[in-house]
Amino acid sequence: MTMTGRGGGNFYVLALVFSGITMHEAATTGQFILICSSLTATIFFWKNKVVDWKLVLLIGGLTLVSAFFGGYYSDKFGGNLMKIIFAIFIFLASVLMLKPFKKQSELSNSYSIRLSLGTIVRHINLYIFIPVVLVTGFVSGMVGISGGSFLVPLIVLVIGVPMHIAVATSTTLVLITATAGFLGHLSTGHFNIEIAVILAIVALTGSLTGTQLTLKTNPEALKIIFAVTSMIAAFIMMYKIFY
């Protein structure tokens, strides 16, 4: 999952729920695992100079706040409702990733900001950008996923960043979102440190492999892998709810 810029929160939470752990505890544990796996991935991408730090600062500030409150208020939502939100959220993300990329000329308007990313100038539509980032942060913090499920489509489709840079940048943002969400969840007391540490060590191995594969994989293949794995996670969670 690190290979597609999501960190793996979708499947961490799924695996924990299927093992009998409550949704609230699974969300907290998932966030902790994400912190560990995305930290190592961020260091790797940073060394390879594929992280767009301007986007990290722009998006990170919004997700930091909204993810914390998502985790903090997660106790107000029932377990099944959180599972439904989880499934709908990542299914929509998979559908969005299958959409064709739009040229920047189609995206810019009077309600956009101009952002220079290296030698390329991008126009970011604030009417789309701000609500999507805030909702992504809140839901990610609440249900324990990385946020990369929506951040990658946002960075690729709305801003027009190449897939490899989007994955690397999203991974860095996952670290920010997961940390904020974890701190919010931690205040509710839903955390089993023994399970979390063991799973985090296992996840680190996959994270190191995934980051290296990212830079070697065709961008279109990354998009398809992203979409298919998101759909699978959504359908598995819906199955868990009704069966």
Question: How does the language model describe each region?
Answer:
Residues 27-28, 167-168, 227:
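Conserved glycine-rich helix-kink/hinge and helix-boundary motifs of the Major Facilitator Superfamily
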Residues 29-44:
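Transmembrane alpha-helices of multi-pass small-molecule transport proteins
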Residues 30-34, 170-174, 195-196, 200:
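Short hydrophobic/aromatic, small-residue-rich stretches within specific transmembrane helices
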Residues 2, 14-18, 23, 43-138, ...:
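Juxtamembrane transmembrane-helix boundary motif
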Residues 135, 168-181:
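Hydrophobic alpha-helical transmembrane segments of multi-pass integral membrane proteins
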Residues 11-25, 150-165:
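Interfacial segments of multi-pass membrane proteins
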Residues 1-10, 140-147:
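Short helix-coil transition sites and intra-membrane helix breaks within transmembrane domains
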